[in-house]
Amino acid sequence: MAIVTLDEMLEAGVHFGHQSRRWNPKMSQYIFTERNGIHIIDLVQTAQLLAEAYDFLRISAEEGKKVLFIGTKRQAANIIAQEATRCGAFYINQRWLGGTLTNWTTIQSRVEYLKELEMREESGALDLLPKKEAAILRRQLEKLRKSLGGIQTMRHIPDIVVIVDQKRENNAVQECKKLNIPIIALLDTNSDPDVVDIPIPGNDDAIRSIKLIIGKLADAILEGSHTKTSSAE
């Protein structure tokens, strides 16, 4: 059975690319046509590459590999958090902190500080501090939760990264490249498919498009994780 149907993708607007003047020529192989100054993405290729990404994630999850979802744009942030949480993956959906992967030991120390602040809040220790000091620490806690909450239980750098919008998340992409972490990316007609391992051409601005593609990738991880659990029993 197909991972996704053409009708599902059409309904979600996956086929709508950017204005043709804003394109990256490297995406030409994934463009079906141009209509009213907008590039239309070839959904047959989208379906094929989504299936490839699905199988890769399913098998990787069976092997116990860990996945990090990245999507910091407004349209993607909530979906990234929901779908990563649903399939037991990690996520970053606010600002990308430089060195998150390439300087992981420093980021780990910030994660530990986040955990410490959370423990102090839960125990009521923050309430015992002077109001001004408690307010400063609570602001720090809120900021750390936003930037690091989705990787709070990540023990080491991820085995695979899933990205929405390669162009926007290029700093994260470059860190993955340095560390040889495989990248799966939903990328629009203004992106560079050469810098990712499995490009999934599609509309990376529309909420329904992002939800459909990221949801399918989360399904793959869930399927692989269930197979792993069943095999262990």
UniProtKB/Swiss-Prot annotation:
Q: Which GO terms describe its cellular component?
A: cyanelle; cytosolic small ribosomal subunit
Q: Report the main location listed first in the record.
A: plastid
Q: Which gene encodes it?
A: rps2
| Gene Ontology molecular functions | structural constituent of ribosome
What is the official name of this protein in its record? Small ribosomal subunit protein uS2c
Record localization: Plastid, Cyanelle
User: Which GO BP terms apply?
Assistant: translation
InterPro entries with a match to the protein in the record = Ribosomal_uS2, Ribosomal_uS2_bac/mit/plastid, Ribosomal_uS2_CS, Ribosomal_uS2_flav_dom_sf
Q: Which Gene3D superfamilies match?
A: Glucose-6-phosphate isomerase like protein, domain 1, Helix hairpin bin
Q: Which family does it belong to?
A: Belongs to the universal ribosomal protein uS2 family.
* UniProt cross-references to HAMAP family, sorted A to Z: Ribosomal_uS2_B
> Which keywords annotate this record?
Cyanelle, Plastid, Ribonucleoprotein, Ribosomal protein
What top-level branch of life does the organism fall under?
Answer: Eukaryota
